[in-house]
Regions:
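Rossmann-like dinucleotide-binding core of oxidoreductases
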Residues: 35-115
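Long, compositionally biased stretches enriched for glycine and/or charged residues
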Residues: 87-216
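Short amphipathic alpha-helical segments, especially helix-boundary/capping motifs
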Residues: 23-27, 62-63, 129-136
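Rossmann-like NAD(P)-binding element
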Residues: 1-35
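Short, charged/polar micro-motifs that form catalytic or ligand-binding hotspots
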Residues: 13, 36, 40, 146
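Short, solvent-exposed loop/turn segments at secondary-structure junctions
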Residues: 4, 45-46, 146
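Hydrophobic, Leu/Ile/Phe/Ala-enriched alpha-helical segments that form helix-helix packing faces
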Residues: 23-31, 50-58, 156-163, 212, ...
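Conserved active-site and cofactor/substrate-binding residues in soluble primary-metabolism enzymes
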Residues: 14-18, 22, 45, 151-158, ...
Length: 216
């Protein structure tokens, strides 16, 4: 847990994990086979907790009789993608994001924004990432609690796109962690968008995945 970084979402983890674990066990008991959607912060670690706890037997051992990984999905990236698009419309330096950019990772400090996949600029991408991450703090400085934008962009709108089988931003299971990326739900399972990622962008994504993996 990276509480020392000041990321409020990580400070929420222990409390929300207990609640997530409770409902994960209920899903196990009901042999639930639908989607288990997580919208509470921090989304990605909580998704992992849901998957783990649903597969834990009453004796504490893992028996893998609970949810499948493809059933668990987190919704936190949509609002960060929307915030990046907002700043891209305001600042011509970031305009390429609107047609060529992508958002990855968690809803928080380890967010990864790429200004463009085709013409990736690491410095610009990091600046746009910082703008999106700090948007919450700017709203709070103005005296508002930012909850409407996440409820729409990460919640309602992304959930509807997901249920319709359309492309959207959400967190899915990937190499042992839940990671936000553009994907869609097909009858055959989850389809992640496959892109030729620049090496610098791959390195940023690996750092984020390693940090997510370290959260217990």
């Amino acid at each position: 847990i990276r509480d020392r970084t000041g990321d409020v979402r990580m400070a929420q983890y222990r409390l929300n994990r207990e609640l997530a674990a409770l409902y994960a066990q209920k899903a196990r008991q009901a042999r639930y086979r639908g989607l288990f959607c997580v919208v509470s912060d921090p989304v990605d670690p909580l998704c992992r907790a849901v998957l783990t706890e649903s597969n834990r037997a009453p004796n504490g051992e893992m028996d893998y009789q609970g949810l499948f990984s493809h059933q668990v999905r987190g919704f936190g990236l949509g609002v960060m993608n929307a915030r990046a698009a907002y700043y891209a419309r305001k600042d011509p330096r970031f305009a390429s994001f609107l047609t060529e950019g992508r958002s990855f990772g968690p809803h928080g400090e380890d967010l990864v924004i790429a200004n463009s996949i085709r013409n990736y600029d690491d410095a610009l991408s990091r600046q746009l990432t910082e703008q999106a991450v700090r948007a919450n703090l700017r709203m709070r400085e103005l005296g508002f609690k930012p909850y409407i934008a996440p409820a729409l962009s990460s919640g309602a709108l992304s959930l509807l796109l997901c249920l319709r089988g359309q492309w959207h931003c959400s967190s899915t299971y990937l190499d042992g962690v839940f990671m936000g990326a553009r994907n869609r739900v097909l009858p055959t399972g989850t389809e992640l968008e496959r892109l030729p990622l620049p090496r610098q962008l791959q390195d940023r994504l690996q750092i984020t995945m390693d940090r997510l993996r370290a959260i217990d």
